[in-house]
């Protein structure tokens, strides 16, 4: 989910559309329609907004639309398929790919640069799968959040050089979750996620945790101050049990409750 210009944008995979809603979740219009034609979408997996344009990842291409839903064009990704959410900023795409490097920067003409640290695991196959990261653009930085390790990295958007790596494994809740995740033996191409979604608003990074301690929950958000040292400043407790995606504006959180199949608007409540 994204908040942009007093509107909420959400990817509806079942309808193969991007929904545009007001802040009370009234549907204003949709972007794309289900199909395989150039201006249509089939199983979109993620999207991002830069300026007045929406980029949607769909079957190995980025499809572009105006915020009002008019189709603009297509950019082919080639073989470097994203394995998590991507960021789109100033005509460049940023994402993680198990095939071509830890993090990819791709220009509109298809020029690719890889950057960042590749996290190492027991086998090459496990390393390939577990390097997935959420990728976000914020001002002149690219921020990545591992989906299974307590790591946040901040890069200069132009030089792609690392500015900071944050390890938040000392947060009590994260200590408990990681201990449980490590104790479970899974196939090399499977792992327990630590993070289910991320969002940036007003200089703060919001990270939605996957809590598998007694039963699966995704209802706690760690807040990081990215304007200073990017350390955790608070934990937010959401009222439901399992949220899939969310966005933030001011003191409001807009989230999709996966268990209830509903959109919810709530005011921040600190644990």
What spans do the regions from the language model cover?
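Structural motif
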Residues: 18-19, 100-105, 149-153, 215-222, ...
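Short loop/turn segments that connect beta-strands within beta-propeller blades
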Residues: 22-26, 66-70, 106-110, 156-159, ...
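Loop/turn-rich, solvent-exposed surfaces of beta-rich toroidal or solenoidal domains
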Residues: 185-226
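Blade-level signature of beta-propeller repeat domains, shared across WD40, Kelch, NHL, RCC1
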Residues: 244-271
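Short coil/turn segments that connect the beta-strands within blades of beta-propeller domains
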Residues: 5-6, 51-52, 90-92, 139-141, ...
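Surface-exposed loop and turn segments in beta-propeller and other repeat-based domains
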Residues: 29-39, 112-128, 163-190, 236-240
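Repeated scaffold domains used in trafficking and secretory/extracellular systems
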Residues: 1, 41-46, 80-89, 130-134, ...
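Conserved beta-strand positions in repeat-built beta-propeller and related beta-rich domains
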Residues: 10-14, 56-60, 95-99, 144-147, ...
């Amino acid at each position: 989910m994204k908040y942009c210009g007093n509107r909420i944008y959400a990817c509806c995979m079942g309808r193969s559309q991007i929904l545009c809603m007001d802040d009370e979740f009234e549907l204003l219009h949709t972007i794309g329609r289900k199909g395989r034609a150039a201006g249509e979408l089939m199983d979109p997996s993620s999207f991002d907004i830069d300026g007045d344009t929406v980029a949607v990842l769909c079957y190995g291409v980025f499809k572009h639309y105006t915020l009002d839903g008019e189709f603009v064009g297509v950019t082919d990704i080639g073989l470097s398929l994203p394995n998590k959410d991507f960021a789109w900023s100033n005509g460049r795409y940023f994402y993680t790919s198990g095939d071509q490097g830890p993090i990819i920067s791709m220009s509109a003409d298809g020029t690719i640069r890889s950057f960042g640290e590749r996290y190492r695991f027991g086998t090459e196959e496990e390393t390939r799968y577990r390097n997935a990261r959420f990728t976000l653009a914020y001002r002149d930085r690219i921020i990545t959040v591992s989906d299974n390790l307590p790591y946040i990295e901040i890069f200069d958007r132009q030089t792609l050089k690392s500015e900071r790596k944050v390890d938040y494994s000392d947060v009590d809740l994260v200590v408990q979750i990681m201990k449980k995740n490590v104790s479970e033996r899974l196939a090399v191409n499977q792992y327990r996620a630590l993070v289910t979604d991320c969002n940036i608003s007003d200089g703060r990074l919001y990270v939605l945790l996957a809590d598998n301690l007694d039963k699966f929950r995704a209802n706690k958000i760690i807040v990081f101050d990215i304007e200073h040292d990017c350390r955790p400043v608070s934990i937010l407790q959401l009222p439901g049990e399992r949220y899939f995606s969310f966005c933030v504006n001011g003191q409001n959180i807009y989230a999709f409750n996966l268990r209830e199949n509903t959109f919810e608007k709530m005011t921040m409540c600190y644990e």
